[in-house]
Amino acid sequence: MNTTKLLGTGALSPSFVFDHDSGNAIFGLSSSTLVVLVAMIAVSTLTLKSVLPGDRSINLPGPRGWPIVGSWFDLGNNWAEYFRQAAKEYGDVFKVHIGNRTVVVVNSPKAAHILFNEHGSSLISRPWFYTFHGVLSKSSAFTIGTSAWSDSTKNKRKAAATALNRPAVQSYMPIIVEESLDAVRRILNDGNAGKNGIVPYSYFQRLALNTSFQVNYGFRMGERDDGLFDEISEVIAKVASVRAVTGSLQDYVPLMRYLPANAKSKAAASYGLRRKKFMSKLYEELEQRVNQGKDESCITGNILKDTESRKKLSRLEIDSICLSMVSAGLDTFANTMIWTIGFLAKHPEIQRKAQAELLAHYPNRELPHVDSEDLVYIHAMAKEASRLFNVFRICLPRTNVSDVTYNNAVIPAGTTFFLNSWACNVDAEKFADPFEFKPERFMDKSASNAHVENKMGGVETYAFGMGRRMCPGVFLALREIYTTLVFLTHFFDIAPDGEYDIDPLTAVEDGRAFSVRPKPFKVRCTPRPGVDLSPVLDKQ
């Protein structure tokens, strides 16, 4: 058997023989040794994939990070605020290495406009995250917002955008009014007309869910829901924790996915199964009502009855639309309103301004009409609340489908982008006194303000993202916030019940959450003198 020396060494290479009978290449090694060798190569390859960072050639500044984990542990419990502070050193756009993924972080309105608007056709897709896409959603649909760009995603977004545009949302106003008044009724009863403090979470969560249910399924949960409300609220919150880009180190260090006791994957799989169970139940019950001719007009019901829509959308795509509708309200509207009622309780001067506007329009204190947003101060309050308590501190991540150049830095296709909407919403150049609650900023129609808007992409707030993958539910969410604020300030004087923190930065329950919400607190809602309570007392 011939042997050859390794170049530059005195060692001999293993014998290389081709076995013509078996067709196997054998390095003078036994079969068991070969198995071990192959396994070692596989593990080494996997390890290298886990520990080597993404494309370090991107010519952008940023923190260096640590071996294997990158900057994971440096980011702390509030990634958005870490990025905002880091931008002071590295600039509005910088890169950060998290595990084996290199992320480009965008921290200012100007930079966001350039990347997400001017390069919008490239930054149109979503990156894949193992725990959410590969485990939790393994046997079910992705939401529209978490789907990579494709013809299927395009069709789903088109269907959702049509169902959630301004005219469509206007047609949902009877539903929004009904659910907002129902929330007022529950607050009135549970708080014993202001004698008892209430924790506001469930009122706005139920309002959000019932609005979504009526709009999407044509039904609402009553007093008895067999635990459906609690199950959906809990599971959607758990799913959101998995969906967050901050959720799991195994999304950035693949080797961790193979640890024998993988609690993250086990929990994610269970949330996925629980979610699939109630989503299937909602769909099948609607399908039954449609077949029996007992359905109410709704988004999914209309799809099921429309032959052309059924041809364009598969069951999985319809499931994706339904899932997006159910989860979106809890993620956005509910958490925004929870913070807002807590803020109003501590700021009676803001309540007085809203109530003065109501009195100017309705001197007899009759029930306000909310079909048009003519209460301009309260309308501005809704926008300001979504800006200052920005629930999505880091928007759903993007990935570019083609190379993008920013300030001479070429960012290759497939790179992950984070839009730091928290930093954008408290940007001092766009928003004067950014940490103050000033609804008046959205009432300024001056030419100078319009110039600032145009320079920064014409986006009023970054609460719903920006560019071609901006949340299509923005009109519905803002209309819900506006309507609820009108009725809350019409019916109640709101006051704190005990001391609590309501600062938008420090009051959050979990700064790493996908959709942040305030730490628990109580408020008292006392009926205002002279206001007719019959619209809520009569609600059954």
UniProtKB/Swiss-Prot annotation:
Q: Do you know which InterPro entries this protein is assigned to?
A: Cyt_P450 (IPR001128), Cyt_P450_CS (IPR017972), Cyt_P450_E_grp-I (IPR002401), Cyt_P450_sf (IPR036396), Cytochrome_P450_fung (IPR050364)
Q: Does the keyword Protein biosynthesis apply?
A: no
Q: Which residues are glycosylated?
A: 2, 100, 210, 400
Q: Which residues cross the membrane?
A: 26-46
The protein's required cofactors: heme
EC no. given is 1.-.-.-
Q: Which UniProt keywords apply?
A: Glycoprotein, Heme, Iron, Membrane, Metal-binding, Monooxygenase, Oxidoreductase, Transmembrane, Transmembrane helix
Q: Where does heme bind?
A: 471
Q: In which pathway does it act?
A: Secondary metabolite biosynthesis
Q: Major place of localization?
A: membrane
The UniProt disruption phenotype note reads: Does not affect the itaconic acid production. Abolishes completely the production of 2-hydroxyparaconate.
Q: Does the keyword DNA repair apply?
A: no
The topology of this chain with respect to the membrane is:
Single-pass membrane protein
Q: Give the UniProt subcellular location, in the record's own words.
A: Membrane
Question: SUPFAM superfamilies under this entry?
Answer: Cytochrome P450
| Recorded GO MF terms | heme binding; iron ion binding; monooxygenase activity; oxidoreductase activity, acting on paired donors, with incorporation or reduction of molecular oxygen
The protein's enzyme class = oxidoreductase
- GO cellular component, as recorded: membrane
Similarity comment: Belongs to the cytochrome P450 family.
Role according to the record: Cytochrome P450 monooxygenase; part of the gene cluster that mediates the biosynthesis of itaconic acid and 2-hydroxyparaconate. Cis-aconitate is secreted by the mitochondrial tricarboxylate transporter MTT1. In the cytosol cis-aconitate is converted into trans-aconitate via isomerization by the aconitate-delta-isomerase ADI1. Decarboxylation of trans-aconitate by the trans-aconitate decarboxylase TAD1 then leads then to the production of itaconic acid.
Q: What name appears for this protein in its UniProt entry?
A: Cytochrome P450 monooxygenase CYP3
Q: Per the UniProt entry, what species is this protein from, by scientific name? A: Mycosarcoma maydis (Corn smut fungus)
Write the gene name.
CYP3
